[in-house]
Design a protein with these regions (language model features):
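Terminal substrate-recognition subdomain of acyl/acetyltransferases
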Residues: 1-40, 71-151
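Conserved acetyl-CoA-binding loop-helix of GNAT-fold acetyltransferases
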Residues: 49, 54-71
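A structural signal for well-ordered alpha-helical segments within the folded catalytic domains
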Residues: 42, 56, 60-64, 91, ...
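Short His-Asn-centered micro-motif
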Residues: 45-47, 66, 84-89
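Conserved acetyl-CoA binding element of GNAT-fold acetyltransferases
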Residues: 40-51
Length: 151
């Protein structure tokens, strides 16, 4: 239902919990959240808001609530979670996240890198400092919600 509206075709995330948001019984948004415990956090991603609901504020409310839940008993790792991380390439969502006091921007990659070239360089024993954007050549910006700001 949501896959045709996401710009990447990817396999399901390992160890992820999937959330669907409803308005009056209609499924309007989706997001996955997976542990990123090596940095004391969770990774929220693959958010999709159905086209007819985009721009209505549903996505931000959904994102904030799902991420807030990661600091509660709803997440089995909640005691280990210090932050929730979220990356997006959507300019409107980036602007909304920067306006929201719950979120801090922590990264941005304004252009993608060639994945095949990176693999070739690594196979040759060369290190690469070229940032990657998943091979889709979109500007990607990263945000973090810290536990203290979530509630």
């Amino acid at each position: 239902m949501f896959e045709p509206h996401h710009y990447l075709k990817l396999p399901r995330m390992v160890a992820a919990k999937y959330y669907v948001g409803f308005v009056d019984g209609e499924a309007v948004c989706h997001m996955a959240v997976a542990p990123k415990l090596e940095v004391g956090g969770m990774r929220a991603c693959r958010m999709v808001v159905m086209p007819e609901w985009q721009g209505a504020g549903v996505g931000m409310r959904f994102l904030n609530e799902v991420c807030r839940l990661q600091f509660t008993d709803a997440n089995k790792f909640h005691e280990r979670v210090k932050a929730v991380y979220f990356h997006t390439s959507h300019p409107g969502l980036c602007a909304a996240l920067r306006r929201d006091k719950k979120w801090a921007q922590v990264s941005q990659i304004m252009g993608g890198a060639n994945k095949a070239d990176q693999k070739r360089r690594l196979a040759q024993g060369k290190t690469t400092s070229v940032p990657s954007a998943g091979g889709h050549h979109r500007a990607v910006q990263g945000f973090k919600m810290q536990r203290a700001l979530a509630v």
